[in-house]
Each structure stands twice: as C-alpha cells, then as structure tokens.
C-alpha cells in the first residue's frame, strides 16, 4: 500500500503494536515509506525501468527491455523474507520487541544489478545494452544449433577459454593477440563470437551438449517449460512434484526449496478455494457457529 493507507484505516503499526509489541510488520511499497516518491504508487514495471535494469537489458540497437515476469516484486519478496527472519531473531535474542520493516520494490532490484554507483563514481561508466554478451567477459552467449535449438555457454575464465579454443579446433586462438586475455576478448568479442557461433551451428543441441561436456566445457541447453517438465535434472532433483487437486486431479507444482536436511518443507494442501477456510478462521478468533451464520446471512462473509 501507499504509505499512510494503514493509518487511514486505523490499523497503522502504532495501533497494532500497542496490542502486540512482538509483531514484525513488513510494509512493502513501490518507493518506500520515506523520500520524495513515498506518496507515489509504484508498480514493478516502473521500478524495473527506473532502477537501471531496463537500461542495461536488451540489444544496443533496440529499446530497453522489461522482464517478462514480476521481477521487482519477486526480489522484494525474497528481501522481505530475509528481513522478517532478521527481525524475529533480534526480537528473540535480546531486542525484546517487534519492529517495522520498510521495504521498497526499488532497493532490492537496484542492489542486485551490481556496483553501478561505485563504478560510475570511479570512471564515469554507464552499463550499456549488449544482448547476451555482457560488458566484462567473453565469450558468453546463446548459440544457435543446426536443429534450430539453442545452447548457452560461458567460457570466460582463462582456463575455460583455453579448453574452448582446443575444443572448437582453433588452438592457435589462445596465443592470438586479439584473444590473449579477457580484456582482449571483450575488446574483440564480435570476431570471437563469430568464430564460436560457426562451430556451434554445425551440430544439433544434443550433439553440442555431448561434445562440449566430454571436453569439460560449460554448455547448457535453452529450455522452455515443455522441455523442463521431463528433463532429467528436474526429475532427479524433484524440483517439481505432483500434488492432488480437487478440481484438476494431479497437478505438477514447484517443490519447496531450499532443501533443509533436518526439516524439509512440504506442500500439505493445494491452494484453497476463495472463502474455503472462512468459517475455520472465524472460529479460531472466537466466533460461535451462530455468529458466523449471522455474518453469512447478512452477506458480510
């Protein structure tokens, strides 16, 4: 909510914590509870644009790109999760009370984009859109294969680059002044990527995966969900599990992660239908069956 909304409803942190001083209250908004934008609404797309993410995503000759998912919201959720654990730990280890977590969508996303502010202060650099190449290491790209599929490869470490040069049957490139060091390869990455791309284009996805894996090169497939649902990694690690659903039968869903050795998570039930647990919740807070029935008769619940 925009800052001030809870206060307008009469349930601001001061009111809630007067009832229970141990509460940890996470306030998530686009721009945070303070600052010149605090009063503004802020959806994830705005944050993805203003944070620097879109400016550095995409190709140099095209418009900035927004992510095809709620990236800012999801990263803020992970940050909030960590903040709640820290606040609970502080409460239980001597601080003795709850606190309010002021979480904007902006700061978590801005933080994972790297030390842009520091780099800009030192040398004035501004990250540019460079597609899959990146600005600091080469070769790194997505490569089309002979069957129309794609693989991703990163051979940016010097030892990996030297293995790659041998694997693509161009060992002389290791001593080529254009590609001698990583800065050299970044400077001349257009020529380098052309050479590497031509080699990948001669083989299918599976042929490339097998060929480079045998030679210790880090290559992986570009997968969509149809590929993933039957992928041996997904199956072997149980990334997705099947759960019973009253409407759809057996449904594949993300399994809980991270995987704790002593107390692994589990999905007890599928998501409830709207209002499915209303009576149960109202009973937990002390309402009788007659009172709940009255609320239903009046259309309140």
Predicted segments, located by residue:
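Active-site-adjacent "lid/gating" segments in soluble enzymes
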Residues: 5-156
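Aromatic-enriched alpha-helical interface/lid elements that frame and gate functional surfaces
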Residues: 134, 139-215, 219
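Short linear loop/turn motifs
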Residues: 175-185, 223-230, 291-301
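A glycine-rich dinucleotide-binding beta-alpha-beta segment and adjacent secondary-structure elements
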Residues: 214-268
């Amino acid at each position: 909510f925009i800052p001030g909304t809870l206060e307008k409803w009469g349930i601001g942190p001061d009111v809630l914590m007067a009832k229970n001083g141990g509460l940890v209250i996470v306030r998530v908004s686009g721009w945070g509870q303070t600052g010149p934008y605090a009063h503004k609404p802020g959806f994830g797309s705005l944050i993805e644009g203003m944070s620097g993410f879109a400016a550095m995503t995409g190709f140099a000759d095209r418009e900035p790109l927004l992510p095809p998912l709620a990236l800012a919201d999801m990263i803020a959720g992970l940050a909030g999760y960590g903040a709640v654990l820290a606040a609970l730990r502080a409460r239980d280890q001597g601080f003795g009370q709850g606190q309010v977590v002021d979480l904007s969508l902006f700061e978590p996303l801005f933080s994972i984009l790297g030390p842009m502010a520091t780099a800009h202060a030192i040398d004035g650099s501004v990250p540019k859109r460079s597609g899959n190449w990146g600005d600091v290491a080469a070769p790194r790209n997505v490569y089309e294969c002979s069957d129309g599929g794609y693989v991703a490869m990163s051979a940016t470490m010097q030892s990996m680059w030297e293995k790659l040069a041998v694997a693509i049957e161009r060992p002389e490139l290791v001593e080529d002044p254009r590609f001698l060091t990583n800065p050299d390869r970044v400077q001349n990455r257009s020529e380098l990527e052309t050479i590497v791309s031509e080699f990948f284009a001669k083989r299918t996805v599976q042929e490339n995966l097998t060929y480079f894996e045998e030679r210790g090169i880090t290559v992986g497939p570009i997968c969509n969900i149809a590929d993933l649902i039957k992928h041996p990694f997904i199956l072997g690690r149980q990334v997705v599990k099947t759960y019973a659903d009253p409407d759809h039968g057996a449904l594949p869903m993300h399994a809980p992660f991270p995987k704790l050795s002593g107390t692994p998570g589990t999905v007890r039930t599928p998501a409830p239908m709207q209002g499915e647990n209303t009576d149960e919740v109202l009973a937990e807070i002390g309402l009788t069956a007659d009172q709940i029935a009255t609320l239903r008769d009046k259309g309140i619940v």
